[in-house]
Structure formats: C-alpha cells, structure tokens
Amino acid sequence: MEPTNGVHQPEEQIVEPATEQMKVAPALLDSTQADPVMTEPLGVAKSAVNGTAITRTPAPERTGQPVIDVSDLRKTYTMGEMEVHALRGASVKIYPGEMVAIMGPSGSGKSTLMNIVGCLDVPSGGVYRLDGIDVSRLTDDKLAEIRSKKIGFVFQSFNLLSRTTALANVELPLVYAGVTGRQRRKRAEESLSLVGLGDRLDHKPNELSGGQQQRVAIARALINRPAMILADEPTGNLDTKTSKEIMELFQSLNRDRGMTIIFVTHDPETADYCQRVIHIRDGLVERDEQLIDHSPEGLRKAVQVL
C-alpha cells in the first residue's frame, strides 16, 4: 500500500496472518457453499485505462444470502490523544460468485475494511455477517478458524517460504489443520495443477518467475477450499503481461468454480477485470459501481438497472 501523507493512518497496512494464526480451532462454520449458476456468455469490454480488450465474466444473480454483509461498520484507532476514524459507517453486501474490487485513495479506509472482512481485525461498531453469522465480536480462536476455513489470502509480496518447494509452501495450511501427509500432498498437487504449475512442484521460489510465485500463493490460498479469496494488490510486483495472466487466472476461478473474489487495489486495470467496483473515501462507501458486461445479455441487464 502507498504511504499516507501527514498523520500515519494504520488502516493502510493490511495485517497478514502470522503462521500461528493459521491454526484451526474446533469447527464453527461449514465451508461448503453451492456454486452460483453461471449460464451467461462472457462479455468483451474495453479497458477504461488503455482501451485493450478485457473479457469480463458476467455477474451472477444477486439472490439468497450475501457472503459478506457489512452494516454501519466503524473503526477508530487511538493514537495518544488523537483518534483516527478509519471507517465511519460503511455498509456493503457482496454475494456468492461476485468478483469485486475495493478502491480508494490512501487513508480512505479500504484496507481497514479489507482487514475486517478478512477476519484479521474487529470493528469498533456496526455489524459484519459472514455467511449469515455475526463475526463482529468473535474470539481470536474462532476468527482464526474462519480465516483458515472460509478465506484464502493473496498478497502483493507472495509471502512464500524461500527454502521450501512450491509443494511444501502450498501444503503449509494443511499442516496446521492436522491433515495427513498423503492427503496434504494430493491436495497440494491438485491445487498447483489448477493454477498451471503441476510441473513445478519441487521448485523453490528463487527458481520461479514472479508470476509463477504468485500462482503458488494462489494455490496456497485455495488449498483449504475457501468460500472466498481476498487479494491485496496481487499484481503489484508483476509486469503488464504477467499481471494479465494472473487476473485471467482469478477470472477462471470466479467463472468456473463460482469463487467469490475481492481485491483491494489502486490499479484501475485490475478493477477493469471485475464485475463491480466499490469506491471508498473518508471511511464511507462513496460509490458502488456495477461494470457493464458488453455481451447482449449484459447490456440488457444494464438497461434494466438504468
């Protein structure tokens, strides 16, 4: 994230879960979630940034219970005698199968919102329901369980263990979940194959390109079969060509597996791949923008909304 000017605002640091935080507490939530029906054709849109063609997956129908239901969310940090209001009553709903970008300038509160949605922090006020369960006031152990079962994290810096293979990096969350060695290897191989690295199992991070390292990180995020992925600037360390490949991988996970994917990003090109962009400013949702799918069905829906 970019540094803020003037007073340092803590919300611009997304807290990355420590290794211990990945340990699994007793079962609380059932991570099984039905895939939304994806019957519409893909829509080809033009990037708002450079005019290149982007294939955008049509948004699923917003039916049933939201995966994420944030209502009047507030977060205040105390710094000496000064209070910093990172969130001032933000409200948003995200439904199963959506691919959403959260954008805003430095100090807007978007990273604080991401931390709370990712169960890495708790709000000072308001309610956050994850799959219908109020997680706003859960204990650290139960939040750790939700992180390990329900949420896959992908960060800009990859966060791979440098001395271990791609396979071992992907297996790591299963070690803390108590999964047997044979099952760990089987699931890690499947996860790496899913992201196109089935032939790189024994390679260490320094033997992989930046794009391949991020694919390993995505495979690790998928290993516990989460309900959603939270990605913080996932293409920030990648060149343009590799960024496009990674975003297309995210799209395939969204389209083919019904994965709910949420990005925090400064990059308009990353947002262009999403179906929806939530703009945060001064701790509030300033605008919730549904991007137009240029397939005939997508255009028909856009006209209906208007």
PLM features per residue range, with description:
Residues 9, 46, 54, 83, ...:
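Polar low-complexity intrinsically disordered regions enriched in Ser/Thr and small residues
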